């Protein structure tokens, strides 16, 4: 039953994957020379809509990837072990509000910079995750493709958020004291089980942060249209 569930999920994902790719509208922020020049030609409202769509898709695919990885490589007993062990997420130290009341109180400026902080903190770890999963025995192509897709779309999302900050705030990027190297270590795990659990924790934490990105961006959108009735 356990393997059948994973197989069925893989079949459905294979059928829906081309559709998901089709409906994803590119941000088109980067030209061949590497300069950000296409996004500035898009209206602020349309750019925000595209950024939100990217965040929605990234969260949806990260959720599917986490579930598929869980079913293929992490027995239920190990899922409980992760919860009991209290694995920490790499963004735990970030000064980003988590409760609804706290989020409602932060400014538009900090909303945008919080999203950018989350996006940039995950680019390296997702590249690492993509590399390690290539060495898994029996890892389905669907899982590998989803991980690669999310990694690429995250870079696109970063470009869109950077331009959005310039459009909405008319300023550059805030500098932070957090560095990706200080938050995430790329050491090789000597034990396969330990490596699997670390990768599972990364996927679970990214799914959580991807959802937070989506929530923050949708709150920003709400404030632009109906500031007095935002959830």
UniProtKB/Swiss-Prot annotation:
Molecular function terms, GO-annotated: growth hormone activity; growth hormone receptor binding
Positions of disulphide bridges: 29-39, 89-205, 222-230
One cellular-component annotation, GO: extracellular space
InterPro entries to which the protein is assigned, alphabetical: 4_helix_cytokine-like_core (IPR009079), Somatotropin/Prolactin (IPR001400), Somatotropin_CS (IPR018116)
GO biological process, one term: growth hormone receptor signaling pathway
Leader peptide range in chain numbering: 1-24
Glycan attachment sites: 145
Tissue: Pituitary gland.
Localization: Secreted
Subcellular location, principal: secreted
Keywords linked to the UniProt accession: Disulfide bond, Glycoprotein, Hormone, Secreted, Signal
Family: Belongs to the somatotropin/prolactin family.
Protein name as it appears in the record: Somatolactin
Organism of origin: Sciaenops ocellatus (Red drum)
């Amino acid at each position: 039953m356990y393997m059948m569930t994973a197989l069925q999920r893989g079949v459905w994902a294979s059928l829906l994957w081309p559709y998901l790719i089709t409906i994803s509208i590119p941000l088109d922020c980067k030209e061949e020379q590497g300069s950000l020049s296409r996004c500035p030609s898009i209206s602020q409202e349309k750019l925000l809509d595209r950024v939100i769509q990217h965040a929605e898709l990234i969260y949806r695919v990260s959720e599917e990837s986490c579930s598929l990885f869980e079913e293929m490589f992490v027995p239920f007993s190990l899922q409980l072990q992760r919860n009991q062990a209290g694995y920490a997420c790499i963004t735990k130290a970030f000064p980003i509000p988590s409760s609804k009341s706290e989020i409602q109180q932060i400014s538009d400026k900090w909303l945008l910079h919080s999203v950018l902080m989350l996006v940039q903190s995950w680019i390296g770890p997702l590249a690492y995750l993509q590399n390690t999963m290539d060495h898994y025995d029996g890892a389905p192509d669907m899982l590998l493709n989803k991980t690669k897709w999310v990694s690429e779309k995250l870079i696109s999302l970063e470009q869109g958020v950077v331009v959005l900050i310039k459009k909405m705030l008319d300023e550059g990027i805030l500098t932070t004291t957090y560095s990706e190297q200080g938050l995430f270590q790329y050491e090789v795990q000597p034990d396969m089980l330990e490596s699997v659990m670390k990768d599972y924790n990364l996927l679970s934490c990214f799914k959580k942060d991807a959802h937070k990105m989506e929530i923050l961006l949708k709150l920003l959108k709400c404030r632009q249209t109906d500031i007095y009735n935002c959830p």
